[in-house]
Amino acid sequence: MATETQPRDRTVPDSPVSDVTYDLMQALTSKLEAIEAHEMYREDAHGDVRQLFDDMLDDDRRHAERLLDALRMELR
């Protein structure tokens, strides 16, 4: 039995923001929480493990900036 996949519209009729805006806000929140956690983990680490957390922080910050830019564009 083949079925076509239809895009889901999860928008709540009275919601003040679109699904995309909400998703971007949630993703940004998660990324900022990850940055905070990785900064703490980095303090405990040394050597290669510390470098790993440094690399993760660089990536997390870059991703957070991209999410913020996308959110700004969505809110225009």
Q: Model segments located where?
A:
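Iron-associated oxidoreductase/ferritin-like identity signal
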Residues: 1-76
